[in-house]
Every structure is written in C-alpha cells, then in structure tokens.
Amino acid sequence: LFSVRIVVDNVRTGLDDQITYSFAESMFHLGSYRKKEKQMDEKAMELLSVFGLESVADYRAANLPYGKQRKLEIARALATEPKLLLLDEPAAGMNPNETEELMETIEVVRKRFGVTVLLIEHDMKLVSGICEYLYVLNFGRLLAEGTPKEVLSNPEVVKAYLGE
C-alpha cells in the first residue's frame, strides 16, 4: 500500500505496465496520452467500485480504515490481471466485521475475476468459510489436506491449531 498516495493512484500503479506511451506523448501530453490516461482512470475507478471504494478514491490511502486498506491492496493487485493471487494472513489485525467483509471480497475475486486465491491464514472461520481445499502445515510439515470439513475434523489438526 502506498499510504501517502490517494486511493485511485494506488490502483493506477497496478495498471502502469498495461499502458505505454512514446516519449513525445508523455512529454507533450498529446491526445493519445490523454486518452490512455483517461482509460487508466476509468479502469481504476471500475476496480474501486467493485470493492465499494469509489467514494474514497481521492482520500489518502493512510486515512482509510484497516479493512478498506486491505480491499485497496487487493484491488491494486487485480489491476495487474493476475491468474493467481497470494494472500498472506489477510485477516491479521482485523475485527470480526472486517473479516466478514474480507471473506466477501475474496469471493468476488474468485467469482468475478476468475482468479485462483492461495491463502495463508490462521483465522479458522475465514479459512472454513471461503476455502475449497486446505493444506495444513505444522512446523513446516504437511499435517493434513482435504476439504475444510475433512481437515477441520482431523484430530491432529484440532490438537495442533484449535486446542484439544
């Protein structure tokens, strides 16, 4: 997250490699430059609207609540049009309402954008609520794998992560 930049500029950063200009276009702000910049603004705003952030597009990213900052990070990542999105403990530091919103956001990412999400997370409610298949590691070793129902009822997983 670029905390000193405004929200829309954070998403535009993810779009930078998709739009190219010639030296003359960027130097003299020729019509094609303005057209490409407008396209980038429109695409950034479209991504922000998907995540309910269009109303804060001109706010500094640092001024957003923590949950919205996470959504912004995901929107910026999606601007690069990935096939795989790796989220490393995205719910860390979130309150239950923010975690619920994050679950909805991840579902949008999977369904609307067709992106595979690889999630590293300790929040079992989040994991069981959105994951289709789990791999559970304990001290770097595979402890269990399977559907959330299978894994979360595995006695070894319960002992290691949920307590006996």
Language model: regions and residue ranges:
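Glycine-rich phosphate-binding loops of nucleotide-dependent enzymes
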Residues: 1-164
